[in-house]
């Protein structure tokens, strides 16, 4: 179980790092600029250089901040993000544990991450961080209500909150054909949830103050930075599980469960 946990964390971290590089490449293409092109072949190892810089950078704790909670909040947020992937979203066997109420479990973890964001701004003792933390937390919690109502309707149709039930229900007919217009609204809400353009309300690229992470740097800033991309990747997987046939398309790769604990 310990080995599987370590492998899972490494695989997810590498996927998230690749997503960060892909997003930067796409943004540079849209904005007609070069983008990352120095480290590795055409900049493909840029995420390794960024990670090395962040992990070797020192951490300064503000004099008025609570040192314990200042360090604990990003650590808790990082733990919440990794806990997402211990659920059975990979497949029936490729998970550390399986719970009957997978959708509820994911929603609770998402709400907990929003609380971490709010408390992060509060314990920084910076008025800009406090305002940004409240703004981000209120936005995330309000969106969770909408997502909860939407997924509740879908779960009533499937008569279960389990990812396995969604896989069985969609063996013949995908739910995307029933909830196409609803999915378009969900995608807009997900953009709001993960603070992606044009809904980057909690933190805009044009602002000098980086929201609730204003006082953070180095390793602790990297945890929040990865947390946003964890949400982005997890919500993408969640949409695939709920609307696009679950893990039925991954059946050729399910032989890997023989090599897991």
From Swiss-Prot:
The keyword Membrane applies. The chain crosses the membrane at residues 2-22, 69-89, 103-123, 138-158, 172-192, 224-244. PROSITE patterns: COMPLEX1_ND1_1, COMPLEX1_ND1_2. It is a multi-pass membrane protein. GO terms for molecular function: NADH dehydrogenase (ubiquinone) activity. It catalyses: a ubiquinone + NADH + 5 H(+)(in) = a ubiquinol + NAD(+) + 4 H(+)(out). Its EC number is 7.1.1.2. It holds the Pfam family NADHdh. Keywords: Electron transport, Membrane, Mitochondrion, Mitochondrion inner membrane, NAD, Respiratory chain, Translocase, Transmembrane, Transmembrane helix, Transport, Ubiquinone. The keyword Translocase applies. It is an enzyme of class 7 (translocase). It is found in: Mitochondrion inner membrane. One of its GO terms (cellular component) is mitochondrial inner membrane. Belongs to the complex I subunit 1 family. Core subunit of the mitochondrial membrane respiratory chain NADH dehydrogenase (Complex I) that is believed to belong to the minimal assembly required for catalysis. Complex I functions in the transfer of electrons from NADH to the respiratory chain. The immediate electron acceptor for the enzyme is believed to be ubiquinone. This is NADH-ubiquinone oxidoreductase chain 1. The gene is ND1.
């Amino acid at each position: 179980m310990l080995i599987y946990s370590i492998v899972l964390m490494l695989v997810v971290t590498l996927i998230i790092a690749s997503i960060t590089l892909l997003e930067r490449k796409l943004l540079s293409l849209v904005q007609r600029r070069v983008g990352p092109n120095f480290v590795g072949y055409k900049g493909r190892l840029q995420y390794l250089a960024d990670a090395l810089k962040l992990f070797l950078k020192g951490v300064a704790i503000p004099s008025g901040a609570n040192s314990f909670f200042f360090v604990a909040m990003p650590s808790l947020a990082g733990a919440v993000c990794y806990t997402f992937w211990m659920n059975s979203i990979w497949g029936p066997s490729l998970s550390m544990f399986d719970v009957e109420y997978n959708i509820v479990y994911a929603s609770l973890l998402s709400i907990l991450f929003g609380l971490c964001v709010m408390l992060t701004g509060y314990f920084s003792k910076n008025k800009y961080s406090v305002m940004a933390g409240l703004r981000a937390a209120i936005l995330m919690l309000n969106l969770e209500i909408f997502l909860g109502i939407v997924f509740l309707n879908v779960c009533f149709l499937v008569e279960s909150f389990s990812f396995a039930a969604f896989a069985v229900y969609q063996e013949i007919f995908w739910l995307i054909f029933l909830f196409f217009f609803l999915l378009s609204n969900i995608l807009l809400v997900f953009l709001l949830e993960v603070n992606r353009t044009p809904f980057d309300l909690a933190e805009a690229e044009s602002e000098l103050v980086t929201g609730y992470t204003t006082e953070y740097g180095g390793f602790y800033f990297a945890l929040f930075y990865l947390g946003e991309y964890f949400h982005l990747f997890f919500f993408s997987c969640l949409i695939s599980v709920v609307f696009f046939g679950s893990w039925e398309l991954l059946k050729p790769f399910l032989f890997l469960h023989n090599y897991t604990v």
